[in-house]
């Protein structure tokens, strides 16, 4: 048994409490309206504005693809937790360097976020209108506002909201905006990293570019090694004990296999060099593809 | 409808009491565990671990061929063994199957350049070859889940001799069906730029998945918890699910962006233009029996995206089945629990005695 949550920052009770709080806000709005209509039919149209406002605020703080990426680059006013990593130098670092001008990117990002807010507003308004229309068409619970009645109102509200949301976020315009938001915020993140790299270089520290170059080199070396027939033969016969354990214990399989797992697999649970050599020969006779 | 001030206050008091009770249960459930079925690690490479589940004492007669489960990179595989009651793995073990599972682990900065070919050929391939050698067999049964389903399709197309039967669960094949909102959102992403930004954090994936249906997934389900069955066991199951939903691992930059570009943006799998390691992935080469299970109400992999498989594979023994549930409901809903394990087990049993595909 494992508890993968021990180190997780997520607290289900906190998420639940947040949702419950918003639910109560909605109920308050429903309840006030119902109370105002006591003795007569409530006028739900007056509640639409309040609902739309609450909803728009929530949408603005919720993640969508573009907004997520913007937040991940550290440019969300809410400071969402899904960051690629902390931008080390803050906004002041977003200046100079090659590529697109970071300040231009910032301005573009702000413009895009403004457009996104326009969509949230449209969705919120449309949801509220749908909600009121359906209530008038007979969707409102009849009789006293009970817990069950309130929940029915809530379910109807969610249905209307989800429909309005789906209609907007499927439009070409919205999809294009999402992509632009994501691309712009990623470009801005990279611009900041370039700046951070410049500072690291000045201080004689390894840069991201250098780390990437090293990784590429290691990868190329691995590929070259794997492509060499001699290396393959040596690995098949188990002739690389330094890199490859002759036999791994199934109970304690911590030993790292060599670069190519195909060969590591050959040194499986019950293999011996002799046995593996016999297997290799058998495979060769059957014309089986070498395992790469 | 009317409500007096006293009645409205009563509603709030009632709901307030329910919130307090549910919160207390949620707090109690914070220590819940997952993955109840005993297993041992039998092979490792990089971050990838291959687990073999230990057979159950009360299991039925064992099957000849082992079953390897390949899960998606974007989520953790413990959803398949969330708790004894909701455990596909356990049902398979009870039926006497020998079950292996791939856990991809967490990509870190050293995995930025890891690509799809690495995951499919080296990691999935390494697991397959290990099992074949360990059992002294020519072919195994393969099960791919969601993105893992795509991997298993690719692997089977490239190595048909190593796979006897293929089972896929919620596996997308056509990435550009009209209902696919995720696909619409991803089409304009600059993947080269994204790849340069490094590994993609799991939290970002969570946010994207949740934003497909934000009100249902971020609001309504919690409110339903308030109003539904909220005994200790139900709350514990809820917490396990929550943890899984918010527990996406980071994604290796290159593999992630390749997946977006090649599949979501270019739809290479169905266009027949996908290559891995210089080898063409031709779904028409898959002549193995295939069982394709997908969710009729799936908001992540729309049913049409998965049902398209039948048009592209070369198998003459292809069975597709839509389950009346959602994406996650495939693993944890009562409907999924009632239908899926039984279908997989009986389908595999019918084919256990048969030889693997012709080479």
Question: What is the predicted function of each stretch?
Answer:
Chain B
Residues 286, 292-294, 298:
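Short beta-strand/loop motif that positions the catalytic acidic residue
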Residues 1-35, 357-359:
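N-terminal targeting or regulatory segments adjacent to alpha/beta-hydrolase or S9 domains
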Residues 140-145, 295:
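Conserved alpha/beta-hydrolase "nucleophile elbow" surrounding the catalytic nucleophile
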Residues 276, 288, 302-311:
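Short alpha-helix in the alpha/beta-hydrolase fold that links the catalytic acid
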Residues 1-5, 11, 133, 137, ...:
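Alpha/beta-hydrolase-fold enzymes
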């Amino acid at each position: 048994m494992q508890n993968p949550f021990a180190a997780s920052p997520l607290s289900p009770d906190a998420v639940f409490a947040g949702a419950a709080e918003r639910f109560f806000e909605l109920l308050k709005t429903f309840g006030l309206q119902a109370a105002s209509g006591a003795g007569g039919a409530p006028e739900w149209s007056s509640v639409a504005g309040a609902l739309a406002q609450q909803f728009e605020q929530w949408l603005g703080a919720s993640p969508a693809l573009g907004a997520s990426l913007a937040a991940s680059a550290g440019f969300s006013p809410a400071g969402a937790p899904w960051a690629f990593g902390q931008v080390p130098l803050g906004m002041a670092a977003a200046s100079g360097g090659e590529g697109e001008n970071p300040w231009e990117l910032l301005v573009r990002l702000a413009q895009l976020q403004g457009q996104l807010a326009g969509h949230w507003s449209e969705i919120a308004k449309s949801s509220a209108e749908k909600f009121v229309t359906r209530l008038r068409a007979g969707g409102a619970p009849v009789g006293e506002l009970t817990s069950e009645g309130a929940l029915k109102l809530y379910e109807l509200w969610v249905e209307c909201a989800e429909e309005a949301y789906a209609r907007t976020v499927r439009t070409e315009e919205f999809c294009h905006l999402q992509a632009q938001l994501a691309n712009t915020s990623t470009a801005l993140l990279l611009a900041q990293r370039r700046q951070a790299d410049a500072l690291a270089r000045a201080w004689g520290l390894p840069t991201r570019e250098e780390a990437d170059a090293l990784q590429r080199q290691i990868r190329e070396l691995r590929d070259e090694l794997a492509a060499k027939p001699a290396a393959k033969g040596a690995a098949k016969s188990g002739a690389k004990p330094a890199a490859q354990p002759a036999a791994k214990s199934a109970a304690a399989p911590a030993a790292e296999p060599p670069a190519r797992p195909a060969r590591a697999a050959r040194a499986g649970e019950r293999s011996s060099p002799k046995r593996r050599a016999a297997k290799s020969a058998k495979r060769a006779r059957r014309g089986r593809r070498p395992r790469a | 409808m009317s409500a007096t001030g006293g009645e409205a206050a009563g509603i709030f008091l009632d709901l307030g009491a329910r919130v307090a009770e549910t919160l207390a249960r949620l707090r109690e459930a914070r220590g819940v565990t997952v993955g109840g079925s005993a297993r041992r690690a039998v092979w490792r490479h990089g971050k990838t671990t291959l687990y073999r589940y230990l057979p159950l004492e009360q299991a039925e007669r064992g099957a000849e061929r082992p079953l390897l489960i390949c899960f998606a990179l974007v989520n953790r595989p413990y959803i398949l063994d969330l708790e004894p009651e909701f455990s596909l793995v356990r049902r398979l073990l009870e039926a006497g199957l020998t079950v292996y599972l791939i856990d991809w682990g967490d990509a870190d900065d050293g995995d930025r350049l890891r690509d799809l070919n690495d995951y499919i050929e080296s990691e999935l391939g390494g697991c397959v070859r290990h099992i074949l050698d360990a059992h002294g067999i020519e072919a195994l049964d393969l099960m791919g889940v969601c993105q893992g389903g795509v991997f298993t399709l690719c692997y089977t197309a490239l190595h048909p001799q190593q796979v006897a039967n293929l089972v896929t669960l919620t596996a997308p094949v056509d990435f550009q069906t009209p209902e696919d909102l995720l696909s619409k959102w991803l089409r304009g992403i600059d993947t080269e730029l994204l790849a340069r930004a490094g590994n993609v954090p799991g939290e970002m994936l969570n946010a994207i998945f949740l934003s497909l249906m934000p009100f249902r997934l971020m609001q309504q389900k919690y409110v339903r918890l308030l109003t539904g069955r909220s005994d200790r066991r139900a709350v514990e199951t809820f917490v396990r699910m929550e943890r899984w939903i918010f527990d996406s691992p980071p994604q290796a930059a290159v593999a992630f962006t390749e997946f977006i570009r090649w599949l979501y943006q270019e739809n290479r799998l169905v266009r027949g233009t996908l290559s891995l390691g210089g080898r063409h992935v031709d779904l028409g080469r898959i002549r193995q029996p295939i069982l394709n299970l997908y969710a009729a109400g799936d908001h992540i992999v729309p049913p049409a995206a998965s049902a398209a498989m039948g048009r592209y594979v070369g198998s003459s023994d292809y069975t597709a089945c839509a389950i009346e549930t959602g994406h996650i409901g495939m693993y944890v809903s009562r409907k999924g629990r009632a239908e899926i394990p039984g279908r997989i087990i009986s389908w595999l049993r019918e084919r256990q005695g048969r030889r693997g595909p012709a080479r």
